[in-house]
């Protein structure tokens, strides 16, 4: 009798198909052989050099003891070289790089950081949308709305990436999880870089300090999440946000970026549920403004960043989804997008411009001077009758016979 896993997930698996199989070997020699045969493209060189440079920067900048940093990097190297673990952790390199840079950001010297902007975001918000949407949404608060905003912002945001990864791994096509790790990691990595290059105060700062200048010695604030701490009798969010690694990281909103990226991947793999995923993103947008953690312009920037990275990932990394298949073990092959075929401006053999002139039928054009005109003309004498309207003939001064 088949076990539940085989009955549910392997029943559609084609015989002798190993597309969805996982690597179970613990022999590092196999990884070394793959590396020797690997021929990286230009994009691969850029990818690894960029991430490697940031990891080296973190290694030098982070104030942790050198022995701990060396041991940590050796541990990562071990995970990368063992086949059973490298298939997950090696593809998660953008995520690991983002996490390393994020937790190192608080140790950057203040004299080398750019000044914190306090007035730009509320000014842009007013110019684009006519008012400060965060202030409007946060004007009226109650316990029900607090809980409703806390769920996506304070709970789902931290657990959703793992849930989405698990669902994509089981019900998406093989290798889709690699694309998700690539896109999710790069979106957050670019977001943290932008937050460090362009530090901006969130709405809660304006509520507490007005428009006075900010400095890096200030502590963060949980904003509306302080009401959740009070409601639940805890001090979790107050402590976490007061000591955040990137206190002035309002722009772009990585809460919005993460929710948008998760929704984009779910819409890609499960298009029938697209309204549900869009509703989740809108729910999180509202919660971030209600809890005074972001302006609407921050949310738009985070979503645009996610969309751009997703589109690049879609055409360079993601497999094509077959919505008629149940799970990863139902696939018989992995197909990816061909950018040249998807380009609407690319030359096509079916285009009329691509057909040689020798293959065109030119009999009509060649015989135009030898045969009388089929269409009546004004200058064919009394036998010609114009096919245009009577008004146009009259305007030429020609009377009908």
Curated annotation (Swiss-Prot):
The record lists glycosylation at: 132
Q: Where is the composition biased (Low complexity)?
A: 382-395
| Topological domain ranges for the Cytoplasmic compartment | 1-41, 86-87, 177-178, 267-268, 313-401
The EC number(s) this enzyme carries: 2.7.1.227
Q: What class of enzyme is it?
A: transferase
One GO biological process term is: mannosyl diphosphorylinositol ceramide metabolic process
Under which name does UniProt file this protein?
Inositol phosphorylceramide synthase catalytic subunit AUR1
């Amino acid at each position: 009798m088949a076990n539940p896993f085989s009955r549910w997930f392997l029943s559609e698996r084609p015989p002798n198909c190993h597309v969805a199989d996982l690597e179970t070997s613990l022999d590092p020699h196999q990884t070394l052989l793959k590396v020797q045969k690997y021929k990286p493209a230009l994009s691969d060189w850029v990818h690894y050099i960029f991430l490697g440079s940031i990891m080296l920067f973190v290694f030098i900048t982070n104030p942790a003891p050198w022995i701990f940093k060396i041991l940590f990097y050796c541990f990562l190297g071990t995970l990368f070289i063992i086949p059973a673990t490298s298939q997950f952790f090696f593809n998660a390199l953008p995520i690991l790089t983002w996490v390393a840079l994020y937790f190192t950001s608080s140790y950057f010297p203040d004299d080398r950081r750019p000044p914190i902007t306090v007035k730009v975001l509320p000014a842009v918000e007013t110019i684009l949308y006519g008012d400060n949407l965060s202030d409007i949404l946060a004007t009226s608060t109650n316990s029900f709305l607090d809980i409703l905003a806390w769920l996506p912002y304070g709970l789902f945001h931290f657990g959703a990436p793992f849930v989405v990864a698990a669902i994509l791994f089981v019900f998406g096509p093989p290798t889709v999880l690699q694309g998700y790790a690539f896109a999710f990691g790069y979106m957050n990595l670019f977001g943290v870089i932008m937050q460090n290059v362009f530090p901006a105060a969130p709405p809660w700062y304006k509520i507490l300090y007005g428009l006075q200048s900010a400095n890096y010695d200030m502590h963060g604030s949980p904003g509306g999440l302080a009401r959740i701490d009070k409601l639940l009798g805890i001090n979790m969010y107050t402590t976490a946000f007061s000591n955040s690694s990137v206190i002035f990281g309002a722009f772009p909103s990585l809460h919005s970026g993460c929710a948008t990226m998760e929704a984009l991947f779910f819409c890609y793999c499960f298009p029938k549920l697209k309204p549900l995923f869009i509703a989740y993103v809108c729910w999180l947008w509202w919660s971030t403004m209600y809890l005074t953690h972001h302006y609407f312009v921050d949310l738009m920037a985070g979503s645009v960043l996610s969309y751009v990275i997703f589109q690049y990932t879609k055409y360079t990394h993601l497999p094509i989804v077959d919505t008629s298949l149940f799970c990863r073990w139902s696939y018989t092959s992995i197909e990816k997008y061909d950018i040249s075929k998807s380009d609407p401006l690319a030359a096509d053999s079916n285009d009329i411009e691509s057909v040689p002139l020798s293959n065109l039928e030119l009999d009509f054009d060649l015989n135009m001077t030898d045969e009388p005109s089929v269409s009546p003309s004004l200058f064919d004498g009394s036998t010609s009758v114009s096919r245009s309207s009577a008004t146009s003939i009259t305007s030429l001064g020609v009377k009908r016979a």
